[in-house]
A protein has these predicted regions:
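Small/polar loops that bind or transfer phosphate-bearing groups
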Residues: 12, 68-69, 93-95, 139-141
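Conserved substrate/cofactor phosphate-moiety recognition/catalytic segment
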Residues: 2-47
Length: 167
């Protein structure tokens, strides 16, 4: 999506404190107390990026900010939504896949600190977002990432989340 929109991008995992990285690398799932400071860091970064692009033309795709992270619970997404309304609206994209496909993707990551054995703990924590209650696009991870990103952007434009100039 970042390539299509030519916008700011942050991989949320890059903001994990070392204690979280060490805990996950050892195969121990994070708990809420581990996640709160990390989620606030992501939200703060998102807010700062939104301030940087605020003065761009409202029809510019460059005005978007893309952040990837595992906001598994609604309360986690609520923290990320705390970007001031005048700076923009936080939209979530929930990438949905089978256990097998998710495991395959995790096993294919090179140099990531979270071992594949932790997938089940992530799925156990997951509260799937409701498109009717949260500004969320639910997308399949079956297509190749570049294909799925294009589908997501098209859906976001169709729903009015992004300007038509993003296509």
């Amino acid at each position: 999506m970042q390539k299509i929109l030519n916008c700011h991008y942050l991989e949320g995992d890059s903001l994990h404190p070392q204690s979280n990285v060490d805990k996950m690398a050892a195969g121990h799932p994070l708990d809420d107390d581990d996640r709160w400071p990390w989620l606030r860091l992501i939200r703060n970064h998102l807010t700062e990026q939104a301030k940087e692009v605020y003065d761009l033309d409202v029809t510019s795709s460059n005005r978007a900010v893309v952040v990837t992270c595992s906001s598994l619970k609604k309360v986690y997404r609520d923290i990320l939504r705390e970007v001031p309304a005048e700076l923009g609206t936080v939209i979530f994209v929930y990438l949905k896949g089978t256990h097998e496909l998710l495991l395959q993707r995790i096993q294919g990551r090179v140099g990531h600190f979270m071992p594949p054995s932790m997938l089940q703990s992530q799925l156990d924590t997951l509260e799937e977002p409701d498109e009717k209650q949260e500004k969320t696009i639910i997308a399949s991870i079956i297509p190749l990432p570049d294909v799925e990103a294009k589908i997501i952007v098209e859906d976001a434009v169709k729903r009015g989340y992004l300007p038509s100039t993003c296509l």
